[in-house]
């Protein structure tokens, strides 16, 4: 791993091992990031196996081309620079219409958080950006400075689950009427100023939830995850598995709901026989989410909110 792209992989063994890797299988890492999951997965593949890696951040791909070089030389890896919401179309274009397993590590990777100029962090002074794909048009600056008051309230409440969403949106509206809000620290101070003193004494940074909300809006994270996970579940071969790591309640709720819909059947109680085409196509590999071990939590504080859910395809 290059120094510029240092990333500690969360739930490394659990995420990959739960895919029940076949040496000659076709797999997808939908969120390449620091390439930790990819490297471990590739170590389990034989010469006939192949891994397709998606990331919309060119730096992640550049880093992986160094760290995964031995597998690249053997022709076992294909990198695809794109949002994972286009996963099905991109794989189909490469002649891949069925996969044996796929993993997602949702959210922002550590290098993106740590790279000051990306504007993801409320702890470092930087321009308001928050784009995972540097070529996309919508930035945090546009959201903060051009979205109407009601839209800001909606985003803050829906994606940040912040009970002071109205007060924060009002404070932003007042500030930007005087001059544009340009920096992360400037926004963080406005958020703090909008909250009552007793709220500021609580654990955690007061701007965390609002920064999360803006980041989700800029990158359409939930919409992309919803589309991509559903497409991935369609692409899975019989006995294929999907692993999804989430870091906040919105992602986890989405994943849990998609897995629940695919693994349960909605028919009247007492029906003697369930028609074959109505039987669930998936089963949950683990009923409850898998959490990081105590040792992992000690070694990596960013793992504390991680949850892993895994499902297996049992019918085509």
Curated annotation (Swiss-Prot):
GO CC terms of this entry: cytoplasm
Reaction(s) this enzyme catalyzes, per UniProt: cytidine(1402) in 16S rRNA + S-adenosyl-L-methionine = N(4)-methylcytidine(1402) in 16S rRNA + S-adenosyl-L-homocysteine + H(+)
Location(s) in or outside the cell: Cytoplasm
Keyword Transferase found: yes
Alphabetical UniProt keywords: Cytoplasm, Methyltransferase, rRNA processing, S-adenosyl-L-methionine, Transferase
The keyword Transmembrane belongs to this UniProt entry's keyword annotation: no
UniProt-annotated binding residues for S-adenosyl-L-methionine: 35-37, 55, 84, 105, 112
GO terms of molecular function: rRNA (cytosine-N4-)-methyltransferase activity
One Pfam family of this chain: Methyltransf_5
UniProt xrefs under InterPro entries: RsmH, SAM-dep_MeTrfase_MraW_recog, SAM-dependent_MTases_sf
Chief site of localization: cytoplasm
Enzyme Commission designation: 2.1.1.199
Enzyme class: transferase
GO BP annotations, alphabetical order: rRNA base methylation
Function of the protein: Specifically methylates the N4 position of cytidine in position 1402 (C1402) of 16S rRNA.
Similarity field: Belongs to the methyltransferase superfamily. RsmH family.
HAMAP family hit by this protein: 16SrRNA_methyltr_H (MF_01007)
Official protein name in the record: Ribosomal RNA small subunit methyltransferase H
Taxonomic source organism: Streptococcus pyogenes serotype M49 (strain NZ131)
Gene name of this polypeptide: rsmH
């Amino acid at each position: 791993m290059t120094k510029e792209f240092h990333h500690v992989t969360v739930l490394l063994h659990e995420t990959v091992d739960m895919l029940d890797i076949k040496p000659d299988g076709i797999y997808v890492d939908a969120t390449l990031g620091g390439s930790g999951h990819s490297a471990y997965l590739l170590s389990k593949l034989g010469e006939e196996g192949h891994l397709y890696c998606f990331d919309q951040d060119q730096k992640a791909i550049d880093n992986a081309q160094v760290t995964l070089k031995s597998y690249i030389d053997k022709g076992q890896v294909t990198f695809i620079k794109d949002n994972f919401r286009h996963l099905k179309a991109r794989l189909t274009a490469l002649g891949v219409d069925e996969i044996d397993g796929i993993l997602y590590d949702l959210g922002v990777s550590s290098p993106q958080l740590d790279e000051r100029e990306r504007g993801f962090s409320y702890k470092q002074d930087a321009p308001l950006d928050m784009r995972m794909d540097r070529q996309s048009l919508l930035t945090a600056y546009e959201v903060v400075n051009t979205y109407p008051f009601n839209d800001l309230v909606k985003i803050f409440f829906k994606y940040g689950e912040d009970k002071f969403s109205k007060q924060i949106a009002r404070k932003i509206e007042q500030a930007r009427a005087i001059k544009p809000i340009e920096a992360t620290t400037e926004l963080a101070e406005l958020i703090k100023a909008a909250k009552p003193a007793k709220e500021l004494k609580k654990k955690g940074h007061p701007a965390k939830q609002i920064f999360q909300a803006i980041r989700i809006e800029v990158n359409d994270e939930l919409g992309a995850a919803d589309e991509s996970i559903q497409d991935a579940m369609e692409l899975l071969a019989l006995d294929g598995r999907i692993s999804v790591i989430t870091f906040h309640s919105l992602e986890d709720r989405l994943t849990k709901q998609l897995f629940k819909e695919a693994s349960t059947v909605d028919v009247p109680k007492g029906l003697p026989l369930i028609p074959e085409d109505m039987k669930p196509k998936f089963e949950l590999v683990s009923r409850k989410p898998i959490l990081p071990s105590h040792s992992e939590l000690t070694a990596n504080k960013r793992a504390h909110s991680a949850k892993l859910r895994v499902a297996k395809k049992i019918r085509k």
